A protein has these predicted regions:
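Short, intrinsically disordered low-complexity segments
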Residues: 1-2, 70
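Low-complexity, intrinsically disordered regions enriched in charged/polar residues
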Residues: 4, 156-160, 194
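Acidic, serine/threonine-rich low-complexity disordered tracts
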Residues: 14-129, 168-267
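Active-site/ligand-binding surface loops and adjacent short beta/alpha elements
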Residues: 130-185
Length: 267
């Protein structure tokens, strides 16, 4: 379970491939979000079910704005771990910390730690304009390895800023946008369509929600997709209010249907 906690990126970039093989259309223009998409001091908790069985739990917390090298920044932390029967089979946890530029909504740095049955994998990324320097160390690596990626004029996000971009996007029905996301050492292209509004049931009661349908693709550093890899599909519901809280995410994978539900929110 790699970062199984977070709206589009959660299901788009984790788990098994969805059973569809269609190739993506040309990337939609990635216009900036209307707002930052993060609220200082907010916290969220989620449960993840696989084929109806509890498989994971996750938490996310947003800090208060501060200053770093003359820029206003905000820190976002998240943690996901196996739970229930899944935890009896394998203990996996994934922690990530992002420093985000408040003005642009872009990531400045990312630190992550994955522990899989006691084996640790670390990864960090430093973002500057259209480039990123990624350092990682797997359990089998004697020392950390570093690679530099150049994306030109394309804006690249981490999981936290991708979530924020979606929350801050005030779209009209049928609108499509493309977001590129770094997850570990891998680059993903995520295409999201604003599908409309509906009322859904949740652990917090019936809520009016806005719905997004998405597809994610493994991408190369030149932003083209790896054509031999099938697309992954997912649906995201955000609360239809000023908070735009992720209420629910669903996806169909070869492992079964994945459902992530919000269980607690405060700000």
């Amino acid at each position: 379970m790699r970062r199984v906690w977070l709206l589009a990126v959660l299901v788009g970039c984790a788990g098994a491939d969805a059973m569809t093989s269609q190739q993506p259309a040309a990337a939609a223009e990635a216009e900036p979000a209307d707002t930052l998409g993060l609220h200082p001091g907010e916290t969220m908790a989620f449960e993840v079910h696989l084929s109806g069985v509890l498989a994971g739990e996750a938490q996310l917390a947003v800090g208060q704005p501060g200053e770093l090298d003359g820029r206003q920044v905000i820190v976002v932390k998240s943690r996901a771990a196996t739970a229930g029967a899944a935890a009896l089979l394998k203990q996996i946890s994934d922690e990530a910390t992002s420093v985000i530029d408040v003005e642009t909504g872009r990531p400045i740095s990312l630190e992550s730690l994955i522990v899989n049955s006691g084996k640790r994998t670390t990864a960090s990324a430093k973002f500057s304009g259209g480039s990123a320097e990624v350092t990682y160390q797997r359990p089998t690596d004697a020392a950390p390895k570093t690679q530099k990626l150049n994306f030109g004029n394309v804006i690249v996000n981490d999981a936290h800023t991708a979530m924020a971009q979606l929350r801050g996007w005030k779209a009209t029905k049928g609108s499509v946008r493309t977001v590129y996301v770094i997850g570990g050492r891998r680059l993903w292209r995520i295409d999201v369509t604003y599908a409309g509004e509906q009322t859904i049931g949740s652990s917090l009661g019936n809520r009016r929600a806005i719905m997004f349908e998405g597809k994610s693709y493994r991408a190369k550093p030149n932003m083209t997709v790896e054509s031999t890899k099938p697309a992954r599909t997912f649906t995201v519901w955000l609360s239809d209010d000023a908070d735009r809280v992720p209420l629910k995410v669903t996806a169909t994978t070869e492992l079964g249907d994945i459902i992530m539900d919000l269980t607690d929110y405060s700000r």
